[in-house]
Amino acid sequence: TAVELIEAGYNVVIVDDLSNSNIKVLEGLKKITGVLPAFEQIDLKDKDATQKVFEKYPDIDGIIHFAASKAVGESVKEPLLYYRNNVVSLINLLELMPQYGVKGIIFSSSCTVYGQPLPENLPVTEEAPHQKATSPYGNTKEINEQIIYDYIHSGASLKSIILRYFNPIGAHPSALIGELPNGVPNNLIPYVTQTAMGIRKELTIFGNDYNTPDGTCIRDYIYVVDLAKAHVTAMSRVLDDEKSPALDYFNIGTGKGNSTLEIVKTFEHATGVKVNWKYGPRREGDIEKIWGNCTKANSVLGWKAETPLSDVLASAWKWQQRLREEGMM
């Protein structure tokens, strides 16, 4: 996202506590863009530290807020960690934004707010009824959406676009930046690439008895670079389009669903590398199948996911190879 923003002419300040990333990402950003963005290592739950960022950079116009804990399985085991991190950080930002004249916030929500959609509601539109969240992670996204809605409807002087991501995957095509999970990855693709590399002994596919064509879960996998382009178009709409509503919602996905098994097989075909995998029991909190109807983002934002799945998975493998070469994993 920082790359796309810089290339679109924005001045970028990155704020991260590095709990699930690495400072070396900044080097990759500079190699790609020629610009070393400003960086502040703070925890957004610390309101005083967050306020100092606004004081240090008084010209901030907009915020893209995706600092959050994001693993469904972990959230079931550590619910309070998720509620504290994901909810408190947003409240701190919303309280500080008007004080410093920040006009808009793009919020990273999730398709988890739809829960397990009824079959007749697939692919889900933004108007699809919200089902009960299947995990604390999903519930934090639902709560945060409601907080933003309530705050804006109270008359707060800011605008927001809520982006409901489906499943972001892949790495920048340069292989200079990508996902850097600390410890055991909670997301599918890093686990696939680490298993293919031999770092992990085997990949477990959680559940093969779902009501899907091959029995494994179905998700809508969106390339991170395509997603980053959506961030830029959303930010432009919030900051520059005076006619845009104070609050709007968009699904950000491909409009297609792929099963976990399809992901593994497509990865093997795209890279020529075999993955050692096995079936395991279902994982608590996982939904069976979901994919998005993204025509609203196509028409209103002028945005569409364009990268083929095989290219996305190849980018993830190229990134994993670079991590090995650099001794980072």
Where are these regions (language model features)?
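A generic fold-level signal
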Residues: 77, 85, 131, 155, ...
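Short capping/connector residues at structural and topological boundaries
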Residues: 77, 119, 127-129, 142, ...
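Short, basic/glycine-rich phosphate-binding loops at helix/coil junctions
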Residues: 170-172, 209-210
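C-terminal substrate-binding subdomain of Rossmann-fold SDR/epimerase-dehydratase oxidoreductases
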Residues: 189-329
